[in-house]
Amino acid sequence: MQIKIKYLDETQTRINKMEQGDWIDLRAAEDVAIKKDEFKLVPLGVAMELPEGYEAHVVPRSSTYKNFGVIQTNSMGVIDESYKGDNDFWFFPAYALRDTKIKKGDRICQFRIMKKMPAVDLIEVDRLGNGDRGGHGSTGTK
């Protein structure tokens, strides 16, 4: 699969083909300082044209909280195929739990390409006809 990618400028670190794993790291496009309890959109310096029928899932790297003390406010970002303009640059929505500095080039999040959900028709019924499994957190408690 080929994906067209545009970089914010010539100083952005180019994304190389991944050698292992299923996720591709993204880097901060500029230095960002965030105070505790502050929200900022961290620019990632890339815009992409995703293939028709696909979307990108963007999540923090496993070390993002440890290294920077930030969490991604929407848990997982979804970028669909329509977000593909020359100025549709990607961002990481960060909420800081401590004062922090993210430097240009720091690996802050990762993404993978996924097929979009097919068209779904929801059919209302009075009963599903299945046994109840249990509530939240009930798996493995019996």
Swiss-Prot record:
Residues binding dUMP, per UniProt: S62, N74, Y83, F91
Co-factor remark: Binds 1 Mg(2+) per subunit, coordinated entirely by the nucleotide and ordered water molecules.
Active site: D80
Record's GO cellular component terms: protein-containing complex
Enzyme Commission code(s) on record: 3.6.1.23
SUPFAM superfamilies in UniProt: dUTPase-like
Cofactor dependence: Mg(2+)
Example of a GO biological process term: dUMP biosynthetic process
Membrane-spanning residues: none
GO molecular function: dUTP diphosphatase activity; identical protein binding; magnesium ion binding
Entry domain remark: The uracil deoxyribose moiety interacts with the protein through Ile-79 and Tyr-83, which discriminate against the ribose form of the nucleotide.
Family indicated by similarity: Belongs to the dUTPase family.
PANTHER family reported in the protein's UniProt record: DEOXYURIDINE 5'-TRIPHOSPHATE NUCLEOTIDOHYDROLASE
Name the UniProt record assigns to this protein: SPbeta prophage-derived deoxyuridine 5'-triphosphate nucleotidohydrolase YosS
Organism of derivation: Bacillus subtilis (strain 168)
Gene: yosS
